[in-house]
């Protein structure tokens, strides 16, 4: 998902999506360790999405503190 689309979402939605992605990352790492992972590139995509969401949440937090 693009950063622009993520910025339009509410923080509660972003937190839910963040939790889902963390769960998915855990599952992917488990599959990697057991040799069942079909697409190792998915780990990179999920980690990037997690970083984007965390960055947007932090930006909103700092914006709220300034006001």
Curated annotation (Swiss-Prot):
HAMAP family for the chain: Ribosomal_uL29 (MF_00374)
Keywords: Ribonucleoprotein, Ribosomal protein
UniProt organism field: Clostridium acetobutylicum (strain ATCC 824 / DSM 792 / JCM 1419 / IAM 19013 / LMG 5710 / NBRC 13948 / NRRL B-527 / VKM B-1787 / 2291 / W)
Keyword Ribosomal protein: yes
A GO term, aspect molecular function: structural constituent of ribosome
NCBIfam families assigned to the protein according to its UniProt record, in alphabetical order: L29
GO cellular component term of the entry, any: cytosolic large ribosomal subunit
Lineage of the species this protein comes from: Bacteria, Bacillati, Bacillota, Clostridia, Eubacteriales
Family: Belongs to the universal ribosomal protein uL29 family.
Pfam families: Ribosomal_L29
GO biological process, one term: translation
Gene: rpmC
CDD domains on file: Ribosomal_L29_HIP (cd00427)
Protein name as annotated: Large ribosomal subunit protein uL29
